[in-house]
Amino acid sequence: MEFKLKHKDGMARVCEITTAHSTFLTPVFMPVGTVGAVKSLDANDMKNELDAKIILANTYHMYLRPTSKVVKDFGGLHGFTKFDRSFLTDSGGFQAFSLSKNSKHFNEGIEFKSHIDGSRHLFTPKSVLDTQYDFNSDIMMILDDLVALPATKERVKISVDRTILWAKEAITYHKSMQNKGIGIGQNIFGIIQGGTDYKERKRCALSLNEMPFDGLAIGGLSVGEENALMYETVQNLNPYLDENRPRYLMGVGTPEDLVENVERGVDMFDCVMPTRNARNGTFFTSFGKFNIKKAEFINDHEAIDPACSCYTCCNFSRGYLNHLFKAKELTFFRLASLHNLHYYLELARKMREAILNNSFTQFKRNFYHLRGK
C-alpha cells in the first residue's frame, strides 16, 4: 500500500491511499457490504452510480456463509462480487461478540456459536488472517478484544493486554506468510482498544505504533458511550498516532460524527447507518434527516434534497418515494440506499475539498448552520 499525507488543516487531513485495486483520497467513507453486497445494490451501482473506491465486507458473515473456500474458488471477493476496486474486511471479532449470546474470550481467541446453525467456532489471530487471505481483501483487520461500555477498569485492561498480544501474533504471522508468497499485496491494520480510559488507550496506541502495521484503527467506540466522550477519546489519541499511516475509526457513524472526527484527524470511516436508515424510510440531507413515510410527503413534488445530484434526486419525487415505501416496493430500498450513500460519499468529498482549501472550520460552521444548529 502506498500512503501519502497530502495536506493538513489543523488536525484534519487529506491523504492518498493506493492499494492493488484502487487509489482513493481521505477522508473516505466506506459503504458496508456485510455479506459481499451493499444491501439492495450491486457492483455496478457502487462503481457507476456512486463511484465508491473502497467498500467493506464482513469476515464473520462470509466465513460462515458461503465460507472462505467458496469465495477463494471465485478468485476472492473481487471475483465473487465483481466489485474490482478495494475491499476492506474486518476480523469478525465484533460480530462474534455481538451476535453470539455465549461467546467466550480467551488469550487464544474468541469462541462463539454461529447465529445461523448454532455450530461452535474459534477465531484466533492467525485464523482470521487465513480467512482474509482467502478473500484477497486489500485491507485486513486483526482480531481484537472488544468490550461493551461501560466496562470495569479490570476488563478494559484485560482487553488492551489481549489486543496487544493478538496484534503481535498477527503481524508476525502476516510477515511470515508474505515470506511464503501468501498475502502479497494485502495490507494489515492494527486496532486500538481501551474503551474511554485515557491511559489504556494511550498504552494500546503506543504499543501498536511500534509494530509495522500498514494502518491503525480505533475500535471499541460508538458502543454505548456519549458522543462527547467518543470525540474526546479520539482527540486524546491523536498525538500518539503515527502521522504517516492511515487512521480508521471503526463503525462510525452519523454525518455529525464524521465531521467531528475528521476534525480530530481521522481518515477512514464505515457504518451501516446510511443503508439501514434508508430501509426504514429515513433520508440524510444537507439540512438534516427526515422520514419519508409522513403524510406531508404524499403530494410533495420536490426531490429528497434539491441540492443533491444523486440518481434518486435527479429522477424521483418525495411523493413517489412516499408511495413506494408505503407499498413496500423493493425498488424503494435501492433508490433510498443510493441517495443516502451518495450523501455520505459527497460529504467526504466536500470535507476533502475544505481541508485542501484550509477552510475546514468554515465548512463545519456551515454544516451545522444548515441543520439549524
Swiss-Prot record:
Cofactor note: Binds 1 zinc ion per subunit.
Keyword terms of this UniProt record: Glycosyltransferase, Metal-binding, Queuosine biosynthesis, Transferase, tRNA processing, Zinc
GO molecular function: metal ion binding; tRNA-guanosine(34) queuine transglycosylase activity
Secretion signal span: none
Catalytic activity: 7-aminomethyl-7-carbaguanine + guanosine(34) in tRNA = 7-aminomethyl-7-carbaguanosine(34) in tRNA + guanine
Amino-acid positions noted as binding substrate in the UniProt annotation, renumbered to this chain: 90-94, 144, 193, 220
Amino-acid positions noted as binding Zn(2+) in the UniProt annotation, renumbered to this chain: 308, 310, 313, 339
Active site residues according to the UniProt entry: 90, 270
Cofactor(s) this protein requires: Zn(2+)
Residue span of region RNA binding: 251-257, 275-279
HAMAP family with a match to the protein in the record: Q_tRNA_Tgt
Family according to the record: Belongs to the queuine tRNA-ribosyltransferase family.
Protein name listed in UniProt: Queuine tRNA-ribosyltransferase
Taxonomic source organism: Campylobacter jejuni subsp. jejuni serotype O:6 (strain 81116 / NCTC 11828)
